[in-house]
Amino acid sequence: MKRKWLMTSLLFLCTALALSACTVTADKPSAAETIKQSLNTMVNEPVLASSSNPNDYIAGHRDVYKAILQTGSEGLNFLLNQLESSDDNGLKEWIMALASAELLGEDNPVQDWDSGKDWLRQYNMIAADHSD
């Protein structure tokens, strides 16, 4: 009886160890990857393509936009760099500017802006004034 119990216990232990060794843990995507994927999902939504209102794209993808906001300061740095390096000034840049403003929270110095590049221009001017 003891031998049967011992063999069963060993078999169970070996099976548990084998299964845990085969388990692959997925790495959490970086802030940059999360933001790139989220922006791509939002701006390439065919159902919303007829809308010119960026808030429609955000409202249609609340969970995706929330993922951008959950990237924190690492995400903010990435968004600012992407806005700076972008040659465009469209929907994607507008969403990046809004996310940046929301990530800054009360520290967002820009209250009135017309486009993503406009927000960035004002942000950079105010930041430069504060660094003097």
Where are these regions (language model features)?
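C-terminal motif of bacterial Sec signal peptides marking the signal peptidase cleavage site
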Residues: 18-21
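Extended repeat-based scaffolds of very large eukaryotic assembly and lipid-transport proteins
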Residues: 25-132
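Bacterial N-terminal signal peptides that target proteins for export
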Residues: 1-9
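Hydrophobic helical h-region of N-terminal Sec-dependent signal peptides
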Residues: 10-15
